[in-house]
Protein backbone atom coordinates (compact mmCIF):
# COMPACT_ATOMS: atom_id res chain seq x y z
CA UNK A 1 0.00 0.00 0.00
CA UNK A 2 1.31 3.43 -0.93
CA UNK A 3 0.54 6.26 1.47
CA UNK A 4 1.20 9.99 1.67
CA UNK A 5 0.80 12.47 4.48
CA UNK A 6 -0.04 15.76 2.77
CA UNK A 7 0.68 18.70 5.04
CA UNK A 8 3.31 16.89 7.09
CA UNK A 9 3.95 19.60 9.66
CA UNK A 10 4.07 18.86 13.39
CA UNK A 11 1.37 16.17 13.64
CA UNK A 12 2.10 14.74 10.20
CA UNK A 13 5.82 14.45 10.84
CA UNK A 14 5.24 12.62 14.12
CA UNK A 15 2.67 10.33 12.50
CA UNK A 16 4.94 9.71 9.50
CA UNK A 17 7.90 8.90 11.74
CA UNK A 18 5.91 6.32 13.70
CA UNK A 19 4.40 4.79 10.55
CA UNK A 20 7.79 4.57 8.82
CA UNK A 21 9.43 3.14 11.95
CA UNK A 22 6.79 0.42 11.98
CA UNK A 23 7.26 -0.54 8.32
CA UNK A 24 4.77 1.55 6.36
CA UNK A 25 5.77 3.07 3.02
CA UNK A 26 4.79 6.71 3.46
CA UNK A 27 5.77 9.95 1.75
CA UNK A 28 5.74 13.06 3.96
CA UNK A 29 4.68 15.98 1.78
CA UNK A 30 5.11 19.60 2.79
CA UNK A 31 5.53 22.82 0.85
CA UNK A 32 8.19 24.05 3.33
CA UNK A 33 11.39 23.20 1.46
CA UNK A 34 13.61 23.63 4.54
CA UNK A 35 11.48 21.10 6.45
CA UNK A 36 11.53 18.64 3.54
CA UNK A 37 15.29 18.98 3.13
CA UNK A 38 15.89 18.47 6.87
CA UNK A 39 13.65 15.39 6.91
CA UNK A 40 15.48 13.87 3.95
CA UNK A 41 19.00 14.62 5.20
CA UNK A 42 18.63 14.17 8.98
CA UNK A 43 15.43 12.15 9.37
CA UNK A 44 12.42 13.03 11.49
CA UNK A 45 13.55 13.92 14.99
CA UNK A 46 10.81 13.59 17.58
CA UNK A 47 11.38 15.01 21.06
CA UNK A 48 9.18 15.72 24.06
CA UNK A 49 7.52 12.67 25.57
CA UNK A 50 9.68 10.46 23.31
CA UNK A 51 13.17 10.75 21.87
CA UNK A 52 13.65 9.21 18.44
CA UNK A 53 15.03 9.86 15.00
CA UNK A 54 13.59 8.02 12.01
CA UNK A 55 14.83 8.22 8.41
CA UNK A 56 11.83 9.27 6.31
CA UNK A 57 11.05 10.15 2.70
CA UNK A 58 9.84 13.72 2.27
CA UNK A 59 8.70 15.61 -0.83
CA UNK A 60 7.40 18.99 -1.83
CA UNK A 61 4.06 18.91 -3.69
CA UNK A 62 5.76 19.53 -7.05
CA UNK A 63 7.89 16.39 -6.50
CA UNK A 64 4.87 14.08 -6.15
CA UNK A 65 4.40 11.40 -8.76
CA UNK A 66 2.44 8.20 -9.16
CA UNK A 67 -0.70 7.13 -7.35
CA UNK A 68 -1.48 6.67 -3.67
CA UNK A 69 -3.88 4.25 -2.00
CA UNK A 70 -4.24 6.53 1.03
CA UNK A 71 -3.55 10.24 1.41
CA UNK A 72 -3.77 11.54 4.97
CA UNK A 73 -4.76 15.20 4.63
CA UNK A 74 -3.30 17.36 7.40
CA UNK A 75 -3.45 20.86 5.92
CA UNK A 76 -5.63 23.71 7.15
CA UNK A 77 -9.24 23.22 6.11
CA UNK A 78 -9.47 26.56 4.27
CA UNK A 79 -7.03 25.17 1.68
CA UNK A 80 -9.16 22.08 0.91
CA UNK A 81 -10.72 23.10 -2.43
CA UNK A 82 -7.31 23.87 -3.93
CA UNK A 83 -5.42 21.01 -2.25
CA UNK A 84 -7.99 18.26 -2.86
CA UNK A 85 -8.33 19.26 -6.52
CA UNK A 86 -4.53 19.04 -6.77
CA UNK A 87 -4.46 15.62 -5.04
CA UNK A 88 -7.30 14.01 -7.04
CA UNK A 89 -5.06 12.77 -9.90
CA UNK A 90 -2.71 11.15 -7.36
CA UNK A 91 -5.40 8.78 -5.99
CA UNK A 92 -5.67 5.18 -7.18
CA UNK A 93 -9.09 4.18 -8.53
CA UNK A 94 -10.13 2.97 -5.07
CA UNK A 95 -7.87 5.38 -3.17
CA UNK A 96 -8.98 7.38 -0.15
CA UNK A 97 -8.29 10.84 1.21
CA UNK A 98 -8.55 10.76 4.99
CA UNK A 99 -9.02 14.15 6.63
CA UNK A 100 -7.20 14.73 9.90
CA UNK A 101 -8.43 18.30 10.27
CA UNK A 102 -10.48 20.41 12.65
CA UNK A 103 -14.15 20.73 11.85
CA UNK A 104 -16.22 18.63 9.48
CA UNK A 105 -14.54 19.02 6.08
CA UNK A 106 -15.64 15.69 4.59
CA UNK A 107 -18.79 16.86 2.73
CA UNK A 108 -16.80 19.54 0.88
CA UNK A 109 -14.05 17.09 0.01
CA UNK A 110 -16.62 14.54 -1.18
CA UNK A 111 -17.99 17.15 -3.59
CA UNK A 112 -14.58 17.18 -5.28
CA UNK A 113 -13.52 13.51 -5.18
CA UNK A 114 -16.71 11.63 -4.29
CA UNK A 115 -17.96 9.98 -1.12
CA UNK A 116 -16.32 6.72 -2.19
CA UNK A 117 -12.91 8.39 -1.74
CA UNK A 118 -13.56 10.38 1.48
CA UNK A 119 -12.98 9.43 5.11
CA UNK A 120 -12.72 11.49 8.28
CA UNK A 121 -10.49 11.02 11.29
CA UNK A 122 -10.00 12.89 14.55
CA UNK A 123 -6.56 13.02 16.17
CA UNK A 124 -6.41 12.93 19.97
CA UNK A 125 -2.82 14.01 20.56
CA UNK A 126 -0.66 17.06 20.07
CA UNK A 127 2.68 18.05 18.61
CA UNK A 128 4.64 21.18 17.78
CA UNK A 129 7.15 21.95 15.04
CA UNK A 130 10.36 23.09 16.76
CA UNK A 131 12.51 23.64 13.68
CA UNK A 132 12.76 22.06 10.23
CA UNK A 133 12.87 18.29 10.70
CA UNK A 134 12.32 18.46 14.48
CA UNK A 135 8.95 18.08 16.23
CA UNK A 136 7.89 17.81 19.83
CA UNK A 137 5.29 15.22 20.79
CA UNK A 138 3.29 16.88 23.56
CA UNK A 139 1.13 13.86 24.44
CA UNK A 140 2.11 10.56 26.02
CA UNK A 141 3.04 7.98 23.36
CA UNK A 142 0.44 5.48 24.61
CA UNK A 143 -2.31 8.06 24.06
CA UNK A 144 -1.83 8.36 20.29
CA UNK A 145 -5.38 7.53 19.27
CA UNK A 146 -7.70 8.25 16.35
CA UNK A 147 -11.46 8.19 15.76
CA UNK A 148 -12.45 7.33 12.20
CA UNK A 149 -15.62 7.80 10.19
CA UNK A 150 -16.60 7.10 6.61
CA UNK A 151 -18.92 8.47 3.98
CA UNK A 152 -21.62 6.19 2.53
CA UNK A 153 -19.51 5.23 -0.50
CA UNK A 154 -16.50 3.89 1.45
CA UNK A 155 -16.22 0.11 1.35
CA UNK A 156 -15.43 -2.04 4.36
CA UNK A 157 -12.13 -2.93 2.65
CA UNK A 158 -11.13 0.72 2.32
CA UNK A 159 -12.06 1.39 5.95
CA UNK A 160 -10.06 -1.64 7.12
CA UNK A 161 -7.04 -0.56 5.05
CA UNK A 162 -6.96 2.88 6.70
CA UNK A 163 -7.66 1.46 10.16
CA UNK A 164 -4.72 -0.95 9.87
CA UNK A 165 -2.47 1.81 8.56
CA UNK A 166 -3.24 4.07 11.52
CA UNK A 167 -2.98 1.21 14.02
CA UNK A 168 0.51 0.55 12.64
CA UNK A 169 1.70 4.01 13.74
CA UNK A 170 2.52 3.09 17.27
Where would I find each of the regions flagged by the language model?
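NAD(P)+-binding Rossmann beta1-loop-alpha1 motif at the extreme N-terminus of oxidoreductases
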Residues: 1-47
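Residue-level detector of alpha-helix initiation sites
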Residues: 10, 78-80, 104
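Rossmann-like NAD(P)-binding element
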Residues: 50, 54-91
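Rossmann-fold dinucleotide-binding core
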Residues: 66, 100, 105-170
Amino acid sequence: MRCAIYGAGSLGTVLGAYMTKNGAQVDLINRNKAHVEALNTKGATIKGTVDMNVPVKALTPDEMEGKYDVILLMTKQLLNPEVVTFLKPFLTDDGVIVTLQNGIPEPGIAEIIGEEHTMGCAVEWGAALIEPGVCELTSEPDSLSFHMGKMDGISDEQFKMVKELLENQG
